[in-house]
């Protein structure tokens, strides 16, 4: 049996789409009624709640389980969607030990569900899927607070079948996202298969099962990671920087290693030099209370990992959410300042080279956003924490390439003076609180820009064309020659030079007509009258001759190397033949 004293509480992050029941789930676990006091029943602030093992065992309803679990409890991070998970970072990794992904079993997967899964996959974080709102399945008879296995047996066969159908829709979508999954009580190996727990956060059905699975995951896969140095200096992550009445700027911090004491010197990441300050007060949430309710705090002299704590200290205004916080002494201060500065610098980007600008609200979300754009091989000129400022807008407006005259903003505001400037500029701004939506929106914008650029090129470029002079269709022999032709490939346009298969340029298309009407161009399969200036029938050209539009070398390069994929099949074939004719004498033509 491991030493319980040096085993910290596992940190659990609750993720999922808005209104799918994250806060209600935590509310049920805590036995408080926070949701009812919040706007729109959506969690507004980052909070952390410590749920001791005794409370969990009580929920499970079997005191004999107490000896099976050695973790001291669970520390839940309560936050909108996946945001805290990215904020809770540790040198590029995830700080949360476990996660719950809440999905409405009736609505299925939504944008932030996919976002949560992508982030968890990236950080290899063990998690459980909670299929919530089973009480809304037609005909479901609720059995308050009972384990799922018990309440499921009390339902009719029709209702059981309906639940299984909805459950397997969730499991199927998880499979599509690259996860093997099964109903939790059918899983034989949680290392290979995700457990899906059907619950009703509203009635409490299935909640004991969620707690049981979380404790099991912590015990089985995390025990080695949960050992901490009780006597060592405190190490944590800033969740949020908050102004508090009577205290000024404070930090909500998750301490994940060591001990933090009142009076300790701490170093915290900021946009400039790391902040060095002394802890004036430590405010700890009481067990089973939310960090954000100040009246429920108690002042303490020290805290030990893992814990959510509010820190009051001078000079915290510039602290960054998502940045590290570490206790230092005289001997370690300089080293820790350098470490924290280098960690912030690793995430921030200021290359001055060509690329987009990224702004995010926390260091963790900036890191996640940069990762996603770099994965797509998007060049980034600048990436930093903070709202979109007037200076950012001016800087982006100096970029000529529309693909890079772009500001991406995750969970940030646009300053009013910046907004006024941007309305008059060509800078494109994308803001959202879903990372992959920002990536998708930018990809869509790039595609639109490329299509517009191609369209402009198509309008100005001479495209490949191949045609045959039809027998019995010589209407005029010269000045200009007027002949009937059939377009065999590509497109023929007025004012384009034409050549024979031997490479000789014989004249210029001066006009095209169909049934007496002048037309600017004719595509494959069309039979039209063509006026060719500079050619004489019987000398340079004759019936049955096959001719090609003589595409200029500069245009041929663009066609072959830049817009080839956008050409039609017959245009590609015509271009290929034309290039092979040109390269008989000069293999490097238009290369």
Swiss-Prot record:
Lineage top rank: taxon: Archaea
Pfam families: GTP_EFTU, GTP_EFTU_D2, GTP_EFTU_D4, IF-2
InterPro entries: EFTu-like_2, EFTU-type, P-loop_NTPase, Small_GTP-bd, T_Tr_GTP-bd_dom, TF_aIF-2_arc, TIF_IF2, TIF_IF2_dom3
Domain tr-type G, residue spans: 7-223
Residues that bind GTP: 16-23, 78-82, 132-135
Signal peptide: none
GO molecular function term, any single one: GTP binding
Keyword Protein biosynthesis included in the entry's annotation: yes
Keyword terms, alphabetized: GTP-binding, Initiation factor, Nucleotide-binding, Protein biosynthesis
CDD domains referenced in this protein's UniProt entry, alphabetically: aeIF5B_II, IF2_aeIF5B_IV, IF2_eIF5B
Gene Ontology cellular component list: cytoplasm
Cited function: Function in general translation initiation by promoting the binding of the formylmethionine-tRNA to ribosomes. Seems to function along with eIF-2.
Similarity comment: Belongs to the TRAFAC class translation factor GTPase superfamily. Classic translation factor GTPase family. IF-2 subfamily.
Protein name: Probable translation initiation factor IF-2
Originating organism: Methanosarcina barkeri (strain Fusaro / DSM 804)
């Amino acid at each position: 049996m491991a030493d319980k004293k040096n085993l910290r509480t596992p940190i659990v992050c609750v993720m999922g789409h808005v209104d799918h029941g994250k806060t209600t789930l935590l509310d049920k676990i805590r036995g408080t009624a926070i949701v009812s006091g919040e706007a729109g029943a959506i969690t507004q602030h980052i909070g952390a709640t410590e749920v001791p093992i005794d409370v969990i065992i009580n929920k499970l309803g079997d005191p004999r389980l107490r000896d099976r679990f050695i973790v001291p409890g669970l520390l839940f991070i309560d936050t909108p969607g996946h945001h805290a998970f990215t904020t809770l970072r540790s040198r590029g990794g995830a700080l949360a030990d476990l996660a719950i992904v809440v999905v409405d079993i009736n609505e299925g997967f939504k944008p932030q569900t996919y976002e949560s899964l992508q982030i968890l996959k990236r950080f290899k974080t063990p998690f459980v899927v909670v299929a919530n709102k089973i009480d809304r399945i037609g005909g479901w008879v609720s059995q308050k607070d009972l384990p799922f296995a018990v309440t499921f047996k009390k339902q009719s066969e029709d209702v059981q079948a309906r639940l299984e159908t909805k459950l397997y829709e969730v499991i199927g979508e998880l499979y599509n996202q690259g996860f093997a999954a099964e109903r939790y009580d059918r899983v034989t190996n949680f290392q290979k298969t995700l457990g899906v727990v059907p619950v009703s956060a509203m009635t409490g059905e299935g909640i004991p099962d969620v707690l049981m699975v979380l404790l099991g995951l912590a015990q089985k896969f995390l025990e080695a990671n949960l050992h901490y140095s009780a006597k060592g200096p405190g190490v944590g992550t800033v969740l949020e920087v908050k102004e508090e009445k009577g205290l000024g700027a404070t930090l909500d911090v998750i301490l994940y290693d060591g001990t933090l004491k009142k009076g300790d010197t701490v170093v915290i990441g900021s946009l400039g030099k790391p902040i060095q300050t002394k802890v004036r007060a430590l405010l700890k949430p009481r067990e089973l209370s939310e960090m954000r309710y100040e009246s429920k705090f108690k002042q303490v002299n020290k805290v030990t990992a893992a814990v959510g704590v509010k820190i009051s200290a001078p000079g915290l205004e510039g602290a960054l959410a998502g940045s590290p916080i570490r206790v230092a002494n005289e001997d370690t201060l300089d080293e820790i300042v350098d470490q924290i500065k280098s960690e912030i610098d690793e995430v921030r980007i200021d290359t001055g080279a060509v690329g987009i600008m990224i702004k995010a609200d926390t260091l963790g979300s900036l890191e996640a956003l940069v990762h996603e754009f770099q994965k797509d091989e998007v060049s980034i000129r600048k990436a930093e924490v903070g709202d979109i400022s007037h200076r950012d807008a001016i800087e982006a407006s100096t970029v000529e390439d529309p693909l890079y005259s772009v500001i991406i903003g995750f969970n940030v505001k646009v300053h009013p003076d910046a907004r006024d400037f941007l309305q008059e500029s060509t800078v494109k701004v994308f803001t959202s609180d879903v990372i992959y939506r920002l990536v998708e929106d930018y990809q869509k914008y790039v595609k639109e820009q490329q299509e517009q650029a191609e369209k402009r090129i198509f309008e100005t470029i001479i495209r490949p064309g191949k045609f045959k002079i039809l027998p019995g269709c010589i209407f005029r022999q010269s000045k200009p020659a007027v002949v009937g032709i059939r377009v065999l490939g590509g497109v023929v346009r007025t004012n384009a030079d034409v050549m024979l298969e031997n490479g000789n340029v014989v004249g210029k298309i001066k006009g095209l007509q169909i049934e007496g009407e002048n037309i600017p161009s004719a595509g494959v399969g069309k039979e039209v009258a063509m006026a060719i200036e500079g050619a004489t029938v019987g000398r340079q050209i004759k019936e049955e001759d096959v001719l090609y539009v003589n595409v200029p070398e500069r245009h041929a390069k663009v066609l072959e190397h830049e817009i080839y994929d956008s050409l039609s099949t017959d245009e590609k074939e015509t271009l290929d033949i034309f290039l092979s004719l040109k390269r008989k004498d000069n293999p490097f033509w238009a290369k």
